[in-house]
Amino acid sequence: MSIFDGKKVIIIGDRDGIPGPAMAECLKGTGAEVVYSATECFVUTAAGAMDLENQNRVKSFTEQYGAENMIVLVGAAEAESAGLAAETVTAGDPTFAGPLAGVQLGLRVFHAVEPEFKDSVDSAVYDEQIGMMEMVLDVDSIIAEMKSIREQFGKYND
């Protein structure tokens, strides 16, 4: 049984990292339902913060389906951007500018290069969709940053 079984997934891809459609393709056959997918330019947004519209989507889908049923997947090219996105969906918007300012959802959040995601999807599809980007990203830094955020702020660390 995958951590994605029966979960509602919000994908926040990165134009310079892992795009949304690549992660969505990997999720086929996992039992997860992608309820929203976007591909952003993290370096284009204010200091790498999560786009206000995406914050609104995360908030409304979490209200609709329940935080315990949600997983957020990010594809940011850099650990710092991935960490900001993860912090936003767990502890609230650190810039205090968006709908998640002061809202501690504590959601499950993973990066596409983390073993929790990679080991839950078809390896051939992963290699085809994400393998090339995995080679150029600083995977160890991304994993360390994501793990740190989950340990500090995650409510659903199963």
From Swiss-Prot:
A single GO cellular-component term on record: glycine reductase complex
Q: What is its EC number?
A: 1.21.4.2, 1.21.4.3, 1.21.4.4
Q: What does the record give as the reaction this protein catalyses?
A: acetyl phosphate + [thioredoxin]-disulfide + NH4(+) + H2O = [thioredoxin]-dithiol + glycine + phosphate + H(+); acetyl phosphate + methylamine + [thioredoxin]-disulfide + H2O = sarcosine + [thioredoxin]-dithiol + phosphate + H(+); acetyl phosphate + trimethylamine + [thioredoxin]-disulfide + H2O = glycine betaine + [thioredoxin]-dithiol + phosphate + H(+)
Per its UniProt record, what InterPro entries does this chain match? GRDA
- Oxidoreductase keyword on record: yes
Q: Which sites are catalytic?
A: U44
Q: Which domain of life is it from?
A: Bacteria
Q: Does the keyword field hold Transmembrane helix?
A: no
Record key words, sorted: Oxidoreductase, Selenocysteine
The family this protein is said to belong to: Belongs to the GrdA family.
Subunit info? Answer: Monomer. Component of the glycine, sarcosine and betaine reductase complexes, together with components B and C.
Its function, per the record, reads: In the first step of glycine, betaine and sarcosine reductases, the substrate is bound to component PB via a Schiff base intermediate. Then the PB-activated substrate is nucleophilically attacked by the selenol anion of component PA to transform it to a carboxymethylated selenoether and the respective amine. By action of component PC, acetyl phosphate is formed, leaving component PA in its oxidized state. Finally component PA becomes reduced by the thioredoxin system to start a new catalytic cycle of reductive deamination.
Indicate what this protein is called per its UniProt record: Glycine/sarcosine/betaine reductase complex component A2
Species, as recorded: Peptoclostridium acidaminophilum (Eubacterium acidaminophilum)
